[in-house]
């Protein structure tokens, strides 16, 4: 019985965090700095159909497949957190997927605007990750 409990706990600990249960922006930013990982922010709104679709049909499958394990992911609702959304976004189009990476020359911003496929988001994350210093 103890063996089953240990395996269950292990499965919970190593499973990716679903996008619906992501950490708040401020905590995600700190975690990205501490772990030297890209910060991926999906900016959207509940009323935005493309935002809901992108979250469920792009981000959620990527998370389930482990494609987000090398990044820190968070979601910012433009209506709930307008100040943070304004800082992160460029323009007013929703959704926006923004990736921040800290390289040798400081933080860089990469983004896509509008509904995006898994392929495009993966390409954006890969491109942003190329500026990360090599870990030894």
What feature does the model see in each segment?
Residues 4-13:
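Sec-dependent N-terminal signal peptides
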Residues 43-57:
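Conserved redox-active cysteine motifs that mediate thiol-disulfide chemistry
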Residues 43-46, 76-79, 102, 114-115:
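Active-site-proximal beta-strand/loop segments in catalytic clefts of secreted hydrolases
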Residues 85-91:
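Electron-transfer interface patches adjacent to heme c in soluble/periplasmic c-type cytochromes
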Residues 21-37:
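A short beta-strand-turn-helix
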Residues 36-39, 44-47, 93:
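Short pre-active-site segment immediately N-terminal to redox-active cysteine/selenocysteine motifs
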Residues 92-136:
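Non-catalytic, surface beta->alpha helical segment in thiol-disulfide oxidoreductase systems
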Residues 19-22, 59, 63-83:
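Thiol-based oxidoreductase modules, predominantly thioredoxin-like and allied folds used
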